[in-house]
């Protein structure tokens, strides 16, 4: 089945182009297909009212935002790609899943995305980060499931605070979830390690936190800078 190229143009709101092809949809081994969509936004703020959010300007959908999506299917293998551009910022997402083996991968890249354009009444601004995940098995309680997660926060501007060099890694193996968080910036220098056994019916985990520098003055919690940085260890 071929999906003819189509165009949807709602003046003042958005324009959408797309098309694709689908074959053997009822056969789980030989089915295949590709669908692509290109969208450019104009004024979509009427959608915020449909979601139940009060249309007070606290949440908006920016004008002239470009969104491209592509979805592919080949037997049990599924792939999806999303590219978003808003002003000088961008977001790219890639994901893949094999429904037979339950093997999956995903990666996310956000570069200079201006969150203030989406939340104009909040004090949140530029965001840059990258993340990737891969694993096997969709049941996190299963001893056979495996997963790895990596996340790096390169830049987050919130109010007068600038966060950077924050890294999170996570692993799942044998129903044991482990995570490590590190932060190395002027506001906070720390490491944290945690683990939790998902197979037990009772809470079974531990956390260790080592803070070598916490700037309470920059956080607005102290009237003047401290002579020595605050440091502590918790476990």
Language-model features, listed with the residues they occupy:
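Interface amphipathic segments
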Residues: 1-235
